Structure formats: C-alpha cells, structure tokens
C-alpha cells in the first residue's frame, strides 16, 4: 500500500520496496446522456448507426502521481435523427514510484486505461438502458495497440513529449 501525503501526492517509495504502480482513486469526472428526439425516436424502424469516439488525457499531479482520464462518446444515429449521445469521462489517480520515464509512459498509455475501461463500459451501458434503449456493450479495446500507434506517430513527428512529460498541475 502506498501512503498519501496531505496534498494528495503519492509518498515516495521506501528504497526497500522498489518500484511501485498503485491505483490511488477511481472516479467519474463527467457524465452526460442526451436523447434529443425522444419519445418519437422509439417508434423509428431504422437500423441505428453507432459512432464511438475514444480519448485519453494524462496530467501529472505531482512527482509520482498522475491523473488519467478516459473519455468515451457514443453517438447513435437513426437515419437522419440522433437517437442518443452518451458521454463518459472516467478518471483515476495513479501512483508511479521508482520507475524510469519509459516504463511510466507505457503504464500511463496501456495499464491505466485498461483499469478504467470496465467502469466506462458499465456506465455507458447503464446510461443507454436508463434512456430507454436496448443495452449496448462496448467491446474490448486494445490499448497496447493504440499506444504502439501513438509511439509510431510520435517518432514520425520527431519525438514529441511522452505522457509522463506533462508538467505538474498547479492550484487554481
């Protein structure tokens, strides 16, 4: 278990324990559901078309703490009309102590979103069902593949900063 300091930052690891990856907190940062054409949309006999948009944001909170936000927007079109738009921003605070920058980058880009994704999947499904629509289950996402693609793009752009390079957030 890691200790937490009074400002929310993860306490440095004891030299005897070595590197550590911890989940400090998981929370919903933002959630929205809109069904602009309800209730008439329920009578439409059109095959719905779904569009999924996925985004990840990383913010350094302190020397060893990072916030990772997994944002998912699912839009369902029924012909020319929008059946619903479900948006979820699921976040977590992760402690990464005693790791090199490359390992931190890999964990932020792969393991953190893998930890957050089941929460996103459940919340999206619950929102859609509560809106009166048939259940929809997000299929697994290959975050390792997405991370590899991001690395490739960074290399093409001349080594853009890694996820771990973000500056600590200031107090607003």
Curated annotation (Swiss-Prot):
Cytoplasm found in the keyword field: yes
Chain segments annotated as transmembrane: none
Major localisation: cytoplasm
Keyword Chaperone recorded: yes
One Pfam assignment: SecB
Gene3D superfamilies: SecB-like (3.10.420.10)
Assembly notes: Homotetramer, a dimer of dimers. One homotetramer interacts with 1 SecA dimer.
Name this protein carries in UniProt: Protein-export protein SecB
Native organism: Stenotrophomonas maltophilia (strain R551-3)
Gene label: secB
């Amino acid at each position: 278990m890691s200790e937490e300091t009074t400002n929310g930052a993860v306490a440095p690891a004891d030299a005897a324990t070595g590197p550590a990856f911890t989940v400090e907190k998981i929370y919903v940062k933002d959630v929205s559901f809109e069904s602009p054409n309800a209730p008439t949309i329920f009578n439409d006999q059109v095959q719905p078309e779904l569009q999924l948009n996925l985004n990840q944001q990383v913010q350094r909170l302190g020397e060893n703490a990072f916030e990772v936000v997994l944002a998912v927007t699912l839009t369902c079109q029924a012909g020319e009309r929008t059946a619903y738009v479900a948006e979820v921003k699921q976040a977590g605070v992760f402690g990464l102590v005693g790791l090199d920058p490359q390992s931190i980058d890999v964990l932020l880009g792969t393991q953190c979103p893998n930890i957050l994704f089941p929460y996103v999947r459940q919340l999206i499904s619950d929102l859609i069902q509560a809106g009166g629509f048939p259940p929809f289950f997000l299929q697994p996402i290959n975050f390792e593949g997405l991370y590899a693609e991001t690395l490739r793009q960074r290399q093409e752009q001349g080594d853009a900063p890694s996820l771990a390079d973000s500056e600590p957030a200031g107090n607003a």
